[in-house]
Swiss-Prot record:
Catalytic reaction annotation: L-aspartate(89)-[ribosomal protein uS12]-hydrogen + (sulfur carrier)-SH + AH2 + 2 S-adenosyl-L-methionine = 3-methylsulfanyl-L-aspartate(89)-[ribosomal protein uS12]-hydrogen + (sulfur carrier)-H + 5'-deoxyadenosine + L-methionine + A + S-adenosyl-L-homocysteine + 2 H(+)
Family of the protein in this entry: Belongs to the methylthiotransferase family. RimO subfamily.
Function in brief: Catalyzes the methylthiolation of an aspartic acid residue of ribosomal protein uS12.
Name of the molecule in the record: Ribosomal protein uS12 methylthiotransferase RimO
MTTase N-terminal domain residues: 5-116
Gene: rimO
TM segment ranges: none
UniProtKB keywords: 4Fe-4S, Cytoplasm, Iron, Iron-sulfur, Metal-binding, S-adenosyl-L-methionine, Transferase
Protein source organism: Acaryochloris marina (strain MBIC 11017)
A GO biological process held by the record: tRNA modification
GO molecular function per UniProt: 4 iron, 4 sulfur cluster binding; aspartic acid methylthiotransferase activity; metal ion binding; protein methylthiotransferase activity
Length: 443
């Protein structure tokens, strides 16, 4: 074991990619490979790439080029490896291996073959693999939080999205498998589980013949983890059964991440979104009625081909009317291989940028107002960082999810400092459009 080459991982992209990274690290550690946190000292650098939009690809390419210039042995994994197989091998002679999105569990074998002098290409044309609770995992998140992937892949065909091509068809894990992993994480002291997949509300449809998210949430309610949070909930999948499960399961937070993408029926139809534009107002009102304390996050795409001034004004009015807690806005990115790539009436980048900036400016006072309502409350905060000099603590309250929302900055005062990764009561004293300020409450 002493002669095993060392490995570092450069992680790029989404939290689904992060779970892949963590499983690769877990498998390598189990096989006796030393993992180095500094790429400069590692024999091999695994670059887990993202290929979702142009900006993500550019970041992946920059990372690969920097490592190639440093003469590193590079193992390219993730969505870009799935997407641009031959191009990457041709352009980067330093790449000793290429591993697709459905093949990351073979990482130990790939490194062994590369060590023997083979240039490895391990890419399944149609990814079908999904790791379960038996696959080793080395977590890279803060102590208190873990992502739990409940399904992989997607059966929809949204016009702008390359993900089904890169990740394959939907395949769900069993409820028993997910609960077993949740129990393992609870035993490690994890306080927050974030459930992820491409479409969380479609969970189980491939395995059980119908969506089983409500049943999964109730099963996870038996696990000793204080916070369970969902990402990527499609509005049409928020059935009365799912709403009831959120309402009645104590550790499931009333936090909904809804990738709405637009409000205008014509744009939604052009996007080939599953609800074809029939939604959005009624569903938002239903959610707010069923879950009055719900925190709503959403994302929108501006500048989709053919989006008119009228379409955009419709979206602005929609955002002002519904007063979401958190909004992310992206400009349309034409992805080769998707139907939207060849659509007529593509908008200039400066028009798209201006629309994004205007929509974000409209949202800012709404987010400020929503955060102001927290001032004076005492809330549970998951402590994630401590400033070494000032002792200031940084964490998240239930209304903030990891990496995408705001933070709570805490003056420790005279109270003893809580452990990183623990939940502690904090009185909120101030707020801006993004973050909260607070003080520890003596216990």
């Amino acid at each position: 074991m002493a002669n095993q080459p060392s490995v570092a991982v450069a992680h790029l992209g989404c939290e689904k990619n992060r779970v892949d990274t963590e499983h690769m690290l877990g498998l390598l550690v189990e096989a006796g490979y030393p993992v180095d946190s500094d790429e400069a000292f590692a024999d091999y650098v695994i670059v887990n790439t993202c290929s979702f939009i142009q900006a993500a690809r550019e970041e992946s390419v920059r990372t690969l080029v920097e490592l190639a210039e440093a003469n590193k042995k590079i193992v390219i994994t993730g969505c870009m490896a799935q997407h641009f197989q031959e191009e990457l091998l041709e352009e980067l002679p330093e790449a000793v291996a290429l591993v697709g999105t459905g093949d990351y569990h073979k990482i130990v074998d790939v490194i062994q073959r590369a060590e023997a002098g083979e240039r490895v290409k391990e890419v399944s044309p149609e990814p079908t693999y999904i790791a379960d609770e038996t696959v080793p995992r080395y977590r890279t998140t803060t102590e208190g939080t873990a992502y739990v992937r409940i399904a992989e892949g997607c059966d929809y065909g949204c016009a702008f999205c390359i993900i089904p091509h890169l990740r394959g068809k939907q395949r769900s894990r069993s409820i028993e498998s997910i609960v077993a992993e949740a129990q393992q994480l609870a035993a490690e002291g994890v306080q927050e589980l974030i459930l992820i997949s491409q479409i969380t509300t479609n969970y189980g449809i491939d395995l059980y013949g119908k969506p089983q998210l409500a049943e999964l949430l109730r099963a996870l309610g038996e696990v000793d983890v204080p916070w369970i949070r969902m990402h990527y909930a499609y509005p049409t999948g928020l059935t009365p059964e799912v709403m009831a499960a959120i309402q009645e399961t104590d550790n499931v937070l009333p936090y909904l991440d809804l990738p709405l993408q637009h409000s205008h029926p014509e744009v939604l139809r052009a996007m080939n979104r599953p609800w074809q534009g029939q939604v959005n107002d009624q569903i938002i009102e239903k959610i707010k009625t069923a879950l009055p304390d719900a925190v709503l996050r959403t994302t929108f795409i501006v500048g989709f081909p053919g989006e008119t001034d009228e379409h955009f004004e419709h979206l602005c009015e929609f955002v002002q009317r519904h007063e979401f807690d958190h909004v992310g806005v992206f400009t349309f990115s034409p992805e080769e291989g998707t139907p939207a790539f060849d659509l007529p009436n593509q908008l200039p980048q400066d028009v798209m940028d201006a629309r994004r900036d205007r929509l974000m400016a409209l949202q800012q006072p709404i987010s400020w107002q929503q955060n102001q309502q927290e001032v004076g409350k005492t809330v549970q905060v998951l402590i994630e960082q401590e400033h070494p000099g000032s002792g200031q603590l940084i964490g998240r309250s239930p209304r903030f999810s990891a990496d995408v929302d705001g933070l709570v900055y805490i003056d420790p005062g005279e109270a003893p400092s809580p452990r990183l990764g623990s939940l502690t009561p904090v009185q909120i004293t101030d707020a801006d459009a993004y973050d909260l300020q607070g003080q520890l409450v003596s216990q």
